[in-house]
UniProtKB/Swiss-Prot annotation:
One of its GO terms (biological process) is lipoprotein metabolic process. InterPro entries: ApoC-1_sf, ApoC-I. GO terms for molecular function: fatty acid binding; phospholipase inhibitor activity. The keyword Membrane does not apply. Residues 1-26 form the signal peptide. Inhibitor of lipoprotein binding to the low density lipoprotein (LDL) receptor, LDL receptor-related protein, and very low density lipoprotein (VLDL) receptor. Associates with high density lipoproteins (HDL) and the triacylglycerol-rich lipoproteins in the plasma and makes up about 10% of the protein of the VLDL and 2% of that of HDL. Appears to interfere directly with fatty acid uptake and is also the major plasma inhibitor of cholesteryl ester transfer protein (CETP). Binds free fatty acids and reduces their intracellular esterification. It is found in: Secreted. Keywords: Lipid transport, Secreted, Signal, Transport, VLDL. It comes from the Eukaryota. Its main location: secreted. The keyword Transport applies. It comes from Mirounga angustirostris (Northern elephant seal). This is Apolipoprotein C-I. Gene3D superfamilies: Apolipoprotein C-I (4.10.260.30). The gene is APOC1.
Amino acid sequence: MRLFLSLPVLVVVLAMVLEGPAPTQAAPEISSTLGRIPEKLKEFGNTLEDKARAAVESIKQSDIPAKTRNWFSETFNKVKEQLKTAFS
């Protein structure tokens, strides 16, 4: 799962970093740009991790999983009863 998420993230970050400065900005040296890549990747990873954890916690605390489970149980029981009456 981590590899599945990390590869697209790495591609996006590298594209953003290697895109270059805007025309109004001074051109930084390549070595300083390449030296900042690891810290930018770490910062981006930490931000992404925090947002993912917050989303998971929000889902855990909501009643959506319980409602979904109840709906599937009720639907399954209805189908089971209909099959019982149809084949008996």
